C-alpha cells in the first residue's frame, strides 16, 4: 500500500521521482513537482479570472452554493500551495538522510538481536499487521468514495471539462492527505524501531533475575580470601613422640577443640543459607559465571540507538510538521462549515437544489476524510512517544532489580543512569508538533473540539430562513 501511495505521490508531483538517489537528473526529478502546480494555478485562474467555466457561473447555483464553492476552492488553494512550497524545500535531501540513518539503525538492531539470540526466534505481530493493513485499506476506500462522488457529480455537470473544476475542488485536499500519509508512514517506521528496542530491553529485564555473577568471600582485614587452618591426625600423632604417652588426653582434647573451630570456619564460609534472604530477591537459580556476550552487552548500543531514533524523529517532524499546520486548519474549517451546511441548509431544503446538495455533501465527505487522516496522524505520533517513554521505564525497572551485571560493572550502571537522565531532557526538548503551535497528540482533539463548539454556537444562531426564501428554496 505504501508503494502505491509513493507512486501516486510522484505522479501528482508531491515527491521527486528518484528521491533515494543522489546522482540523477535534477530536471527529471523535479519536473512533475513543477508541472502539476503550474497546471493547478492555471485552472484556478481560469475559473476565477476568465469566468469561462466554474460552478459559480451556473444559473442553478444560488448564493449559498456560491459562498460554499468559493470557500471550498480558496481554502483548497491555500492548502495546496502551502504544502507544495514546503515540499520543494529540501525534500530529496530528507529522503536520502532518512534512509541512510534508518539503514544504520537497522544494522545495529540486527547485531543486537544476534547477541540476544532473538534472530532465532520467529517474532509474530499478527495483530499489529492486521491493524496496519486495515487502516490503510479503510483510508483507501474513503478516498476512493470521495473522489468518485466528486468526479461523477462534476462530469454530470461539465462533461469532458470536469477535470478543470476538479483541480480546484477535491485535488488540493487529496494532495494534502497524501502528504499526511507520507508523514504517517515515516512515524510508523520510527515507532516500529522503538518497539524493537523495547523488545531487546525487555529480554534483558526478564534475564536480570536469572543470571548472576559468582560470589566470593573476602577477609576484610587481610584483603584476601579466607583460608582454613586444618589440623590433621598425623600432626597430633607426631606430637606424641615428643610429649610422651602421658599427654594423650591433653592432645585428644586439643583435637576436639580444633575440630570445633574448623566447623565454625566452615559455617562462616557457607553463604548458601543467607542467599535466600538477600535484599536483591533473586530467584532460586544456579549461579554461573557469564562466559561470552549476553543480552546485557547490548545496553550501550541500545542507548545509542534510542538517541539516534529520537534524532530521526526530530528530522521527520521538521520535514512534515509545518505541513500539518495548513492541513489541520483546512480540516477545522471544512468540518465546521460541513456541520453548519448540513444542519442549517440541508435539513431544511435538502433535495431542492442539486448543486447545493452537491456542495453540502462535498463538505461532509471531505470533513470526515480529513478528520480520519488527522486522527491517524495523532494516534501514531502518540504511539511513537509512548514507545519512546516505555524504553526509559524498562531501563528504570532493570535498575530497580539490581542485577549482578550492574553491580559487578560500573559501566552498565553509569550508562543506565545517564540514559534515564538524558531521556528526561529529550522529553522536555522534543515532541511531535506543528512548528510549535500545537502538539500532535490526543490533547489536540480536545482543543479542536472546544474551539469548534464555540464557533458552531455562533454560526448556528444565524437565521437562514430569509436567505433560503429569497433564493426560492422555501415557500
UniProtKB/Swiss-Prot annotation:
> Is this entry keyworded Transmembrane?
yes
Q: Where is the composition biased (Acidic residues)?
A: 265-281
Residue intervals on the Extracellular side: 56-68, 150-158, 341-357, 463-475
Note down the stretches annotated as region Disordered: 243-281
Query: Where is it localised?
Result: Cell membrane
What transmembrane ranges does the database entry give?
Answer: 35-55, 69-89, 129-149, 159-179, 320-340, 358-378, 442-462
Q: Does the keyword DNA damage apply?
A: no
Supply one GO molecular-function term: ligand-gated monoatomic ion channel activity
* Swiss-Prot/TrEMBL keywords: Cell membrane, Membrane, Receptor, Transducer, Transmembrane, Transmembrane helix
Q: In which tissues is it expressed?
A: Expressed widely in gustatory receptor neurons (GRNs) that respond to aversive chemicals. In larvae, is expressed in neurons of the terminal external chemosensory organ, and the dorsal, ventral and posterior external chemosensory organs.
Q: Which GO terms describe its biological process?
A: chemosensory behavior; detection of chemical stimulus involved in sensory perception of bitter taste; male courtship behavior; male mating behavior; monoatomic ion transmembrane transport; response to toxic substance; sensory perception of bitter taste; sensory perception of taste
Cytoplasmic topological domain ranges are: 1-34, 90-128, 180-319, 379-441
Signal peptide bounds: none
Family named by the database record: Belongs to the insect chemoreceptor superfamily. Gustatory receptor (GR) family. Gr66a subfamily.
Q: What is this protein called?
A: Gustatory and pheromone receptor 33a
Species annotation: Drosophila melanogaster (Fruit fly)
Amino acid at each position: 500500500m505504501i508503494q502505491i501511495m509513493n507512486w501516486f505521490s510522484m505522479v501528482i508531483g508531491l515527491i521527486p521521482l528518484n528521491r533515494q538517489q543522489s546522482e540523477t537528473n535534477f530536471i527529471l526529478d523535479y519536473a512533475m513537482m513543477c508541472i502539476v502546480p503550474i497546471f493547478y494555478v492555471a485552472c484556478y485562474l481560469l475559473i476565477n479570472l476568465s469566468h469561462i467555466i466554474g460552478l459559480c457561473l451556473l444559473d442553478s447555483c444560488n448564493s449559498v452554493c456560491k459562498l460554499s464553492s468559493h470557500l471550498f476552492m480558496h481554502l483548497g488553494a491555500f492548502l495546496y500551495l502551502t504544502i507544495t512550497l514546503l515540499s520543494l524545500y529540501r525534500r530529496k535531501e530528507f529522503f536520502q538522510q532518512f534512509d541512510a540513518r534508518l539503514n544504520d539503525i537497522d544494522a545495529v538492531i540486527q547485531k543486537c538481536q544476534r547477541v540476544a539470540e532473538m534472530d532465532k526466534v520467529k517474532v509474530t505481530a499478527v495483530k499489529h499487521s492486521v491493524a496496519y493493513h486495515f487502516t490503510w485499506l479503510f483510508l483507501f476506500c474513503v478516498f476512493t468514495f470521495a473522489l468518485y462522488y466528486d468526479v461523477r457529480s462534476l462530469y454530470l455537470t461539465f462533461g469532458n471539462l470536469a477535470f478543470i473544476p476538479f483541480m480546484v475542488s477535491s485535488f488540493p485536499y487529496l494532495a494534502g492527505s497524501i502528504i499526511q500519509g507520507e508523514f504517517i508512514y515515516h512515524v510508523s517506521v520510527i515507532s516500529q524501531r522503538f518497539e524493537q528496542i523495547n523488545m531487546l530491553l525487555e529480554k534483558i529485564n526478564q534475564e536480570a533475575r536469572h543470571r548472576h555473577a559468582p560470589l566470593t568471600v573476602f577477609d576484610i582485614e587481610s584483603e584476601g580470601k579466607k583460608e582454613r587452618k586444618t589440623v590433621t591426625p598425623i600432626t597430633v600423632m607426631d606430637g606424641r613422640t615428643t610429649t610422651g604417652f602421658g599427654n594423650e588426653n591433653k592432645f585428644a582434647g586439643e583435637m576436639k577443640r580444633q575440630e570445633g573451630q574448623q566447623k565454625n570456619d566452615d559455617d562462616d564460609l557457607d553463604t548458601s543459607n543467607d542467599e535466600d534472604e538477600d535484599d536483591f530477591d533473586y530467584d532460586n537459580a544456579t549461579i554461573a559465571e557469564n562466559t561470552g556476550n549476553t543480552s546485557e552487552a547490548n545496553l550501550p548500543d541500545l542507548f545509542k540507538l534510542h538517541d539516534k531514533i529520537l534524532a530521526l524523529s526530530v528530522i521527520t517532524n521538521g520535514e512534515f510538521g509545518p505541513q500539518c499546520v495548513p492541513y489541520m486548519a483546512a480540516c477545522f474549517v471544512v468540518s465546521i462549515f460541513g456541520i453548519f451546511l448540513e444542519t442549517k441548509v440541508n435539513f431544511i431544503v435538502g433535495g431542492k437544489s442539486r448543486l447545493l446538495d452537491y456542495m453540502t455533501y462535498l463538505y461532509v465527505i471531505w470533513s470526515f476524510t480529513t478528520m480520519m487522516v488527522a486522527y491517524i496522524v495523532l494516534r501514531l505520533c502518540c504511539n511513537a512517544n509512548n514507545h519512546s517513554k516505555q524504553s526509559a521505564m524498562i531501563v528504570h525497572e532493570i535498575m530497580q532489580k539490581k542485577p549482578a551485571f550492574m553491580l559487578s560493572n560500573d559501566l552498565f550502571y553509569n550508562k543506565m543512569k545517564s540514559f534515564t537522565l538524558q531521556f528526561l531532557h529529550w522529553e522536555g526538548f522534543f515532541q511531535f508538533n506543528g512548528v510549535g503551535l500545537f502538539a500532535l497528540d490526543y490533547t489536540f482533539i480536545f482543543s479542536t473540539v472546544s474551539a469548534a463548539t464555540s464557533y458552531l454556537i455562533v454560526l448556528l444562531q444565524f437565521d437562514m430562513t430569509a436567505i433560503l426564501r429569497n433564493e426560492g428554496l422555501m415557500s
